[in-house]
Each structure stands twice: as structure tokens, then as C-alpha cells.
């Protein structure tokens, strides 16, 4: 009985983590740290972003504050796959333990 409760607790926690990783997928944004002044033209902003060590792939000027914002794909696909494999392994181990008892 205690193993079943533990199994369901781990499964629910894993699903919550999986859902959290899924909501973060998409595009990561950050303000360009070396940009000075008002951002009016996209081309210099893109150049500034690509020169950053964070390996940004694109950039654009924000509409209201006119700041240079750098963008890149978030690396959550790998994290999601890893998390899914870990959850599967944990679930299989718990089921195996329940069967042995």
C-alpha cells in the first residue's frame, strides 16, 4: 500500500515537472547587455546579439522602450526528453518493486 502511494506521488510530481518544461518551450529572450542607446533599426541589434557569448540567433527592437532584445530557441526539448526517460525508469522500478513484494 505504501509503495502505491509513493508511486502515485512520484508520477504526479513527474507530470507536474513535465508540464512545467513544456510551458517553457519556445523562444528565450534577453536584453542585449552591450547595447547602448535607443534601438531603432533591427540590423545593428541582430549584429549585437549574435556577437554575445550566449549564442543568440536573432534580435529585434522592443516596441515601447526601444531596447535591443536578443532571442534564441530554448533548449527545453532535450530537457523534456531526459525528464520523460527518467520518469519512465522510476515508474518501471516502482512497479517492479510492487510486484516483488
UniProtKB/Swiss-Prot annotation:
Any Gene Ontology CC annotation: extracellular region
Location(s), subcellular: Secreted; Vacuole
Temperature section of the record: Stable under extremes of temperature.
Residues cleaved off as propeptide: 75-101
Presence of keyword Signal: yes
Signal peptide bounds: 1-25
Alphabetized UniProt keyword annotations: Antimicrobial, Disulfide bond, Fungicide, Knottin, Plant defense, Secreted, Signal, Vacuole
Recorded effect of pH on activity: Stable under extremes of pH.
Main location, first listed in the record: secreted
GO biological process, one term: defense response to fungus
Keyword Secreted assigned: yes
Annotated disulfide bonds: 28-74, 32-48, 39-61, 45-68, 49-70
Post-translational modification: When compared to other plant defensins, the petunia defensins have an additional fifth disulfide bond.
Pfam families (UniProt xref): Gamma-thionin
Tissue specificity of this protein: Petals.
Domain notes: The presence of a 'disulfide through disulfide knot' structurally defines this protein as a knottin.
Family to which the UniProt record says this protein belongs: Belongs to the DEFL family.
Role according to the record: Plant defense peptide with antifungal activity against F.oxysporum and B.cinerea.
Entry protein name: Floral defensin-like protein 2
Protein's organism: Petunia hybrida (Petunia)
Phylogenetic placement of the source organism: Eukaryota, Viridiplantae, Streptophyta, Embryophyta, Tracheophyta
Amino acid at each position: 500500500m505504501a509503495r502505491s502511494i509513493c508511486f502515485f506521488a512520484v508520477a504526479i510530481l513527474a507530470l507536474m515537472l513535465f508540464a512545467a518544461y513544456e510551458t517553457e518551450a519556445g523562444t528565450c529572450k534577453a536584453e542585449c547587455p552591450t547595447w547602448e542607446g535607443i534601438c531603432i533599426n533591427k540590423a545593428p541589434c541582430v549584429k549585437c546579439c549574435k556577437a554575445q557569448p550566449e549564442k543568440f540567433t536573432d534580435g529585434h527592437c522592443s516596441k515601447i522602450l526601444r531596447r535591443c532584445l536578443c532571442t534564441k530557441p530554448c533548449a527545453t526539448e532535450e530537457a523534456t526528453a531526459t525528464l520523460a526517460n527518467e520518469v519512465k525508469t522510476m515508474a518501471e522500478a516502482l512497479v517492479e518493486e510492487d510486484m516483488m513484494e
